Amino acid sequence: MVHSESSILSSLRGGDGGGIPCSKDELAINGSYTDPMGRRKSKRFKVAAESEFSPDFGSITRQLRSRRMQKEFTVETYETRNVSDVCVLSSQADVELIPGEIVAERDSFKSVDCNDMSVGLTEGAESLGVNMQEPMKDRNMPENTSEQNMVEVHPPSISLPEEDMMGSVCRKSITGTKELHGRTISVGRDLSPNMGSKFSKNGKTAKRSISVEEENLVLEKSDSGDHLGPSPEVLELEKSEVWIITDKGVVMPSPVKPSEKRNGDYGEGSMRKNSERVALDKKRLASKFRLSNGGLPSCSSSGDSARYKVKETMRLFHETCKKIMQEEEARPRKRDGGNFKVVCEASKILKSKGKNLYSGTQIIGTVPGVEVGDEFQYRMELNLLGIHRPSQSGIDYMKDDGGELVATSIVSSGGYNDVLDNSDVLIYTGQGGNVGKKKNNEPPKDQQLVTGNLALKNSINKKNPVRVIRGIKNTTLQSSVVAKNYVYDGLYLVEEYWEETGSHGKLVFKFKLRRIPGQPELPWKEVAKSKKSEFRDGLCNVDITEGKETLPICAVNNLDDEKPPPFIYTAKMIYPDWCRPIPPKSCGCTNGCSKSKNCACIVKNGGKIPYYDGAIVEIKPLVYECGPHCKCPPSCNMRVSQHGIKIKLEIFKTESRGWGVRSLESIPIGSFICEYAGELLEDKQAESLTGKDEYLFDLGDEDDPFTINAAQKGNIGRFINHSCSPNLYAQDVLYDHEEIRIPHIMFFALDNIPPLQELSYDYNYKIDQVYDSNGNIKKKFCYCGSAECSGRLY
């Protein structure tokens, strides 16, 4: 589907997860993706902000340039075992357009030369090599409002090998320095190498040349061996490299102090939300798995903040786990070890590349970058971050200067008869004695005052803080593989201990720990309090959707009497008369697409399912889901975002940023949150809204501009605020049509998000590049409150 001003460039942007190999160096700083051959539109001149990574990770630069500046790509590809391994894909989009616009004729693409990476055009559906059904035509489609007849065409597509093209190269020029939060930082500007692109005026051919630096062109063979290795083994702890006793037990962030009084803006969005995208360099990791940081948003200008490293490590760990799990499910016979083996293997992969933090370092007190309320799905994550090193034992300890054992952390997850409540006091049962829930039938025995028990006892006199991690039942994930989350509860002091006879008739040790005052409260405690009360404090609307979503979305205001702004709620995109979605060709998978090697929808995603257990595996250029004519059931693994909201969300009044969005339950990393829905506009319509564009979301590139307007008609996505350290990212998804210039904007979780934490994504505004209707530069302060906040929204 296209509109009346389509251009030849539409034939070039045939991106998806595998149809067009694309680098994650084209992923934006908010996690979204920009096709290497066409960017999201932004009319204003763009500057660059660089975020540096470790040497083996390369650097990430926000590719924010003016349309006249061109780009150069570094390409990494793979040598396949045989010709059949190369999957040649093509777009299957049927589009409608008004006569009079230029339409590119389809030329056959003969070959792909890895030396110059010239990209040509290929024939349409014939190159797929899979059996697809023709889409049903809508005979009840309303007539076009245009006086001219509609014409259906099949856009040309691009054929490339299946693997990703890697790397976008840009140069930085230091232009000066500035003071920010008491620090002196360098201000740089992107100087992009030139990249040639030619478009024939007669509309017959469209070819793009990509220059490649020879030293960055890497050909790698894909191994097919057993990547999991022998039977599972218990992961051994690393020997201590250094131990640290902190002088300060609790590190508290300074409160946010707005520098000016805010007016009644509904949400922080003002001017255009732009989903500019930058991809990140991938490095070879193992025979089948490579680590990338998946288009992760930068958390600081230098990329070396402790908080950023924690988030990066967790994102890499979960991406690796999901890939291993997908490979394991594809095996004809499952091997012993199950989920524990997978997380151990993922942990070993990260450690082999130096992506673990403090796991060999013993720390007393606060672990850098870890905040109270952080949630984890696996205990192995605690090991990677150095929060709690043992993969199974409940007590972690070390030797102090005098050679005495002291406790550093405990995990209270229900294995023993611990007293868990909402107070700041924890009664913890010691370890040993076969008291816990064991698979074997060993008889219980008295616990001994040794190792971890002795360390907790010594911590009474030492008065050293002990980290407490609580295990909380998790009901968010679709499967029951993960039974609980692990939540960092903060620092406690051990006050006393005693012996008592347990229910099994043997002696056990009990330890009383008290939470150190001044730390943030765990959000699940607040959720539990609200569930107990009959009426919700501050509730001003029980359902802003008026029943249009599968779950009600309430509005809460505990600050004043203001009500949510009036608007018409729509759960789906609204297309104008000149743009009519035509369903894509379908797959014939009647039992779901999880194990079908010949599924047309999986082929369009590069032969890999983009989701696992209802969560996205990694950030992709474009995700194709099964369409309305596919024969698979609604429960198909390829239908995640099209079924609407599945997480309990609410809007709430913030102190300084209008209305925001949060969840009443834990959100696992990779979970679908919601769509950014509204009315589709042409760019010329959007330009007329200057000064009234708080809810505009730009689509397409600078030559094919489209915009979603959620001002009058929209969904909960219109309330999601900006953050310089976001926990969501925007992912392009297609399912009801295949016009890649008008994708659905779907928000997915970048991290494990605890309850009541505000949801946010990066608007990607440019400082001093936003103007009012008179051409004057507009300035707006940022109140996101993150440690990496730049201080200005634009």
From Swiss-Prot:
Although the SET domain contains the active site of enzymatic activity, both pre-SET and post-SET domains are required for methyltransferase activity. Its EC number is 2.1.1.-, 2.1.1.367. PANTHER family: HISTONE-LYSINE N-METHYLTRANSFERASE SETMAR, HISTONE-LYSINE N-METHYLTRANSFERASE, H3 LYSINE-9 SPECIFIC SUVH5. It is found in: Nucleus; Chromosome, Centromere. Signal peptide: none annotated. Its main location: nucleus. Histone methyltransferase. Methylates 'Lys-9' of histone H3. H3 'Lys-9' methylation represents a specific tag for epigenetic transcriptional repression. Coiled coil: none annotated. This is Histone-lysine N-methyltransferase, H3 lysine-9 specific SUVH5. Gene3D superfamilies: SET domain (2.170.270.10), SRA-YDG (2.30.280.10). Residues 187-210, 254-276 are annotated as: Disordered. It comes from Arabidopsis thaliana. It is an enzyme of class 2 (transferase). Residues 258-276 have a biased composition (Basic and acidic residues). The keyword Nucleus applies. One of its GO terms (molecular function) is histone H3K9me2 methyltransferase activity. Belongs to the class V-like SAM-binding methyltransferase superfamily. Histone-lysine methyltransferase family. Suvar3-9 subfamily. Residues 585-644 form the Pre-SET domain. Residues 647-764 form the SET domain. Expressed in leaves stems and flowers. Residues 365-515 form the YDG domain. Residues 194-203 have a biased composition (Polar residues). It catalyses: N(6)-methyl-L-lysyl(9)-[histone H3] + S-adenosyl-L-methionine = N(6),N(6)-dimethyl-L-lysyl(9)-[histone H3] + S-adenosyl-L-homocysteine + H(+); L-lysyl(9)-[histone H3] + S-adenosyl-L-methionine = N(6)-methyl-L-lysyl(9)-[histone H3] + S-adenosyl-L-homocysteine + H(+). InterPro entries: H3-K9-MeTrfase_plant, H3K9_HMTase_SUVAR3-9, Post-SET_dom, Pre-SET_dom, PUA-like_sf, SET_dom, SET_dom_sf, SRA-YDG_sf.
